[in-house]
Amino acid sequence: MRVKLVEESEGLLARVLNIRLKSFLVGTPKRALSSSHNKYCEAGINTGSPRGIVEIYRRFDSKSLNEMCSDEKKRNKIRYEFSSAIKKARKNEMVALIPEIKITEDHREKSVEFLSDMLLHPRINLVAVPIFWNAPLPKVFENIRLFVEACSYADDLWIAPTVMPLLPLELEKLIKEYQKLYDQFTNFLMNYMFIDFSRSNPVSRYDLLRFVLRNTKKLSSEIDSPICLHGVNIKYGKAVHKENVVPAKDLISPYVGIDIIGSNHKPLPLPREYVARKKIKILDVNDYGYWDLNYAFNKKILEPEGSLITLDQLKGLSHNKTWAEVMAKIYNVEKQSLEMPRISKIIVENPSKVNKYLDGKNSLDDRTRKIVKKAYGDVYAQRTLQV
């Protein structure tokens, strides 16, 4: 894999990268589309979204892995769902696999190896180190190494590190472990990195973002290559049912150094009383706000060129809340995707105007704007003592 810096903005961390992997070429910033066996997934519905990279996210726990090792029916079911997800990717799209594994007491070490054998389809170009959780760090390292070793035998497959939301000292150890794997395995990358924001976003989890930015700046110098940052499980915020409009903190990602925006694959279990009050939010890329659906209808949002999913279509579905929620999500994904080339064009044509473009997004709150400025300062401002 080759990662090339095309252009970067002035005063912000927004940039344009070209990522080449074999015959695949992906330009950033980019919104990755999620694919699954569900026909209504992001990659399965025809929209105006610029394509380029598809992510397949698969969740396991130790029990399901153990069953998969001994139950042929369960193996066949997973194979079918996995194959169905892959078919939704187009020929010119890069496919990234992102496993998540909850480790419990009945965990078998070999199950991670068997999982890699089953999931490594020839169409998969890139696999993320699994998001391991519910286990002490030594156990996580042990399973990471087992998984990487098993994947290292696959032809034409690249393995990318995943930064998980751990404690600072644990994150330091995790990066060192990845550097060891990079030195040992030729198909282990360090110029492409996944970051699990775990139902949050780079603004709300600035501590995690800052750690990644600080470390990738050093690593980039060591490997003599830019490092593409692919954020997964990004969500615009929590408890947003209380407001009629909330800032699009997920859409801020490209301005703070996240090159590829992934979907949120971690649904939050909600109490019934919350579900009853939950309001459908619609993205307006003109002001970077998520608006309540009824407000969006009255606001008459100017939709970006290339939109295939429109507010008029959503209005026709408003009587069916379940279906309206499904299509509202697709609507938002399409609008996020269409915004990425607009950001890219401004960066390439006039890097000094990116700041002005972002300043014009009126739904962003002061804290979000401060974080965007702070991210740039934290990466590029070097403070030294004057002697």
Residue ranges and their predicted role:
Residues 1-156, 321-387:
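Non-catalytic, usually N-terminal nucleic-acid engagement modules in DNA/RNA processing proteins
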